[in-house]
Amino acid sequence: MHNLSRLGLSLMLTASLGACSQQSTYHRPDLDVAPAWQQESRGLTAQQAGPWWQGFQDPALDRLVEAVLAANPDMRVAGLKLKNALLGADLADTNLTPSVSANLGASGTKNMKDGSASSNLGPSLNLSYEVDLWGRLAAARDQASWEAQASEQDLAATRLLLIGKTLEQYWQLAYLGSAITLGTQQLANLERIERLTRAKYEAGAVTRLDLVQASQQKAGKQAELATLTQQRAQAGNALRLLLGRSSGSLADAPDALIMGPIPSVAAGIPADVLARRPDVRAAELRLRKTLARGDEIRTGFYPTLSLTGGASTTSDTLTQVLQNPDR
């Protein structure tokens, strides 16, 4: 027990030595950007967060975005990377605290001459602690912390990218649906024009050139419709991939463009907008991680100080302690 007391006193006396840190100081560089947008902000707030796509007031779009965020494989991978980084940060934190190990040993002997036997039970407790003299352990902890924060921004960037792609494919499907509907109506008109032109040609009212031109216009519209139909199929496949599947129906896919409200865009100064991007935040955090890695490597050449202590007892001593705890 005296060893443990001395160890605790030593830990308190040497904890202040961590002030000898050799960590680098990070300074965010100043950006040469315009102080404000050239256009008027019209009094809108400089921060816009949350489910901003709901500003379009389209329930089908809202359901589709939520389905993509729940089922997309990239979101799951980014989530797993974040969990792994958080576990790494928790593990790095344990390097700054004492490590404790306990053992329980038992042994027995028997005298072959007189048949007497004896047994011993020996529990032991060991403590070890590395004093972070130069900030090496703190640098390792900072690395894990920066990586965890960067992984969180990676998840946010993946989420933002998927939302953008979902909206893009959604409106592409809507536009192509409207274009196909309009093209089908135009094709029907061109077919009627061709029939009328053919009748006039057979009656001698128009030349063969007029008939050929009418037929070419119909054929051109048919080719255009075929291209639009193929593009719509490709947009549907892209949306299925966002949903994490390669086939099946798209219940919330639009058939035509619907004119609805367009949400206002919150405007701020360019530097603020740039700093809010998750990919920019992740890059800055990983830069700080790199600086911490350099600190760890540099301080790794310095001497280290480790404190250890232990306590053990045998079965006889343990029995006495249990019988007389005041001793």
Region spans (language model):
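Terminal intrinsically disordered/low-complexity segments used for targeting and assembly
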Residues: H2-A70, S145, T229-A275
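Amphipathic alpha-helical coiled-coil scaffold segments and their short linker/junction regions
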Residues: A46, L69-A71, Q143, V206, ...
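Extracytoplasmic/secreted envelope proteins and their assembly/folding machinery
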Residues: W53, D62-V65, G79, A89, ...
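Small/polar (Gly/Ser/Thr/Ala-rich) solvent-exposed segments
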Residues: L96-S118, S128-A157, L176-A179, R281, ...
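Hydrophobic, lipid-facing positions within transmembrane beta-strands of outer-membrane proteins
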Residues: L121-L127, I269
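Periplasmic alpha-helical coiled-coil/stalk elements that build and connect Gram-negative outer-membrane
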Residues: L137, Q153-I269
